UniProtKB/Swiss-Prot annotation:
Pfam families (alphabetical): Toxin_8
Region named Lacks the Ser-Xaa-Pro motif that is crucial for potent interaction with nAChR: 52-54
Disulphide bridges: 50-56, 51-64
Positions of the propeptide segment: 22-48, 65-68
Organism: Conus caracteristicus
Chain's role: Alpha-conotoxins act on postsynaptic membranes, they bind to the nicotinic acetylcholine receptors (nAChR) and thus inhibit them. Has possibly a distinct nAChR binding mode from other alpha-conotoxins, due to a different three residue motif (lacks the Ser-Xaa-Pro motif).
Family: Belongs to the conotoxin A superfamily.
Residues the record lists as Sulfotyrosine modifications: 63
Protein name: Alpha-conotoxin-like Ca1.2
Free-text note on domains in this protein's UniProt record: The cysteine framework is I (CC-C-C). Alpha4/7 pattern.
Compartments (UniProt record): Secreted
MF annotations from Gene Ontology: acetylcholine receptor inhibitor activity; ion channel regulator activity; toxin activity
Modified residues (Cysteine amide): 64
Length: 68
């Protein structure tokens, strides 16, 4: 295998790695955004004291950790 052929194979491997990395990164952005939104809602409810109030806690059970 000549130097030119080895260099071509190297470039193809780099390109394939970049494409796979880029597409998997974009796929995870949606999951990260959803988790970030839920976390920010939980922080907002907790800071306001909502999770300490029974009625508010029942209405926001998903954010306050369930019904107790």
């Amino acid at each position: 295998m000549g130097m030119r052929m080895m260099f071509t194979v190297f470039l193809l491997v780099v390109l394939a790695t970049t494409v796979v990395s880029f597409t998997s990164d974009r796929a995870s952005e949606g999951r990260n955004a959803a988790a970030k939104d839920k976390a920010s809602d939980l922080v907002a409810l907790t800071v306001r004291g909502c999770c300490a109030i029974r009625e508010c806690r029942l209405q926001n059970a998903a954010y306050c950790g369930g019904i107790y």
